A protein has these predicted regions:
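Glycine/small-residue-rich interface belts in oligomeric ring/scaffold proteins
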Residues: 6, 22-70
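Internal, well-folded beta-alpha domain core
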Residues: 14, 69-229
């Protein structure tokens, strides 16, 4: 039986997107990548989620953890669509140790999930460098989740299978993340953020947009030099 090198199961996934100025974002990514726009804007997304399980070649690793990843949407030198990650924070020490292998810049910080008081069911928070960077309070709707229509804005955000990364001396890397189509459901949410400022990224030029998914399973392949792709 074929086994994926690394399988990550995620649950209770809250995608929080911000529109940003494309020219400003272009200066924040490697010069060999290009910003991809949707609805005439560039976008940065924070994904606040629970890692419910991790396995390598079928062997379970670690315990459930809370994580946040921050990414944007790019095209590579040959026009391939993909993702570029600015950073991540997690409660899982194994993930922290694997960060260089996955080209993820894990930062020191605190990420938490708790049952919320008041109007919303769940509260997720992120602290970076001693500052509250992000608070999301949300309640998923009662309607069942479904896959995003092709060529829609939600599909632009979630249906991505290629990840670009950079390394020492200007080296270029690419990896693949396989998954079934994401199922997204309705959600009511409020967002308080200073995240982009904390990470020295371009400030939002509009209101945040939130999507919710009950979860998915991701098959992660090792990164390789771009010239081997």
């Amino acid at each position: 039986m074929s086994r994926k090198p690394l399988t990550v199961r995620v649950a209770d996934v809250c995608f929080c997107h911000w529109p940003v100025d494309p020219d400003a974002l272009e200066r924040a990514i490697p010069s060999w990548l290009s910003v991809e726009r949707a609805a005439d804007d560039a976008w940065i997304t924070a994904i606040h989620h629970t890692v419910s399980g991790v396995s390598a070649f079928g062997v379970d690793l670690g315990n459930p953890a809370q994580s946040v990843t921050v990414r944007t949407y790019v095209t590579g030198p040959d026009g391939q669509r993909g993702l570029y990650f600015f950073g991540a924070v997690t409660t899982d020490p194994i993930a922290n140790a694997a960060g260089p292998l996955l080209r993820l810049n894990y930062r020191d910080g605190r990420v938490a999930r708790r049952e919320a008081d008041g109007d919303h069911r769940t509260e997720r928070t992120l602290d970076v460098d001693g500052r509250r960077a992000l608070t999301i309070r949300y309640t998923p709707g009662d309607e069942p989740a479904s896959t995003a229509p092709p060529d829609s804005l939600p599909a632009f955000f979630v249906e991505r299978f290629r990840v670009f990364g950079d390394g020492p001396l200007g080296s270029k890397f690419v990896g693949n993340v396989g998954h079934d189509p994401w199922e997204l459901g309705p959600v009511e949410a409020t967002v308080e953020e200073d995240l982009l400022s904390v990470l020295s990224l371009p400030e939002p030029i509009g209101d945040s947009l939130v999507h919710y998914s009950p979860g998915n399973e991701l098959g992660v392949s090792p990164f390789r030099p771009l010239w081997l792709d």
